[in-house]
Amino acid sequence: MSELINIKELNERIERESVFVDTLRQELGKVIVGQSHLVDTLLIGLLSNGHILLEGVPGLAKTLAITTLAKAVDANFSRIQFTPDLLPADLIGTLIYSQKSEDFVVRKGPVFANFVLADEINRSPAKVQSALLEAMQERQVTIGDDTYSLPEPFLVLATQNPLEQEGTYPLPEAQVDRFMLKAKISYPKKQEEREIVRMNLSGAGMPKVEKVVTPEDIVKARKVVEDVYMDEKIEKYIIDIIFATREPAEYNLEKLQPLIAYGGSPRASISLAKAARAYAFIRRRGYVIPEDVRAVCHDVLRHRIGLTYEAEAENITTEQIITEILNNVIVP
C-alpha cells in the first residue's frame, strides 16, 4: 500500500514540477503554428539529455523551432551550416597565435552553445561528422592539449533533407545510433498554413518570445524526470519491443524476418525507456504507461532498424515494421 501512496505523492510532485512545460509550449506556440510533434520531440530530447536528428524538406520551421526554444530557455544558440569544405576546426575551435601575448590562444567554435543546429549534417565529410558526434557523446572537446567541457544543457539538433542525396555523405549506422530520436517533420495542415501566411504578412512581425525558463531549471527538471516511476511490466514491454526487432519469429512475426537486416541495440532500449519517461513528464504524469512507450517508439527506432534488400525492393519502410511490431507485442 505504501508504494501506492508514494506513486500518488510522486504524481503530485511531478504535476507541480512540470508546470513550466505548459508555459514553454505556450511561448513556442506564439511563433510556431502546429508542428506539435516537433515541439514534443524537442522537449523530450531536452529533458532526457538526448540529441535529435530531424528529417524534412526545407521550410518546415526546423530552424525557427530551435531558435525559439533557445530564446524561451534563455540559452545560447548556434547554427552550423554543413558544407563539403567544412573542417573539424570550424566546428570545435582552434588555437590561434596572438602577437599581443606571443602565445597561442583558444578560439572556441560554434559547438560551444546550449543548442546547436547542425544544418544538413550529411553535406560534410565523415571527419567533420565524427567531430560533432564525438562532442555529442563525450560532452567535451579537445583543442590542442586541453579538454573543454561543453555547456549544460547541451542539445544537438541535426537536420537532413530527404530529397537531395547528390553530393552527400550519408551518416554511418554507428553514428546515427548516437541520436536518441529521429523525427520526420511533415507539412502543416491547410488551416495552419493559412495562419502561417497571415502571421508573416501582418505588419506587426513575429510575436516576441519571452524568457520563461533558465538552463538551470532544465538541468533540475532532468533530475525530476529520472524519478518518474516505471513499472517492471513497462520495462518488460520495452525489452519485448526491442527484441522483436532482433528476433521477430519469437513474437509470431516470421514475415518480418527476411525484411530486417539488424535490429535495435541495447542503446535503443535505454533511449526508449528515457524517452518514455520524458514523455510522461511532459504529459504532467509521475508514472509511465504503455501509451507513452508507443508514442515515442517510432522516433526512437526509426533509424535503428536496418532493412534488407528484399524490404527495399518491396518499398517497405521502418515505420511499417515498427507499427507491425507494436500491433503484435503484448501490451501490459
Where are these regions (language model features)?
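Conserved AAA+/SF3 P-loop NTPase catalytic/coupling segment centered on the Walker-B
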Residues: A89, P110-Q137, P151, E166-Q175, ...
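C-terminal engagement/docking regions of AAA+ P-loop ATPases
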Residues: M1-E9, I14-E15, P248-P332
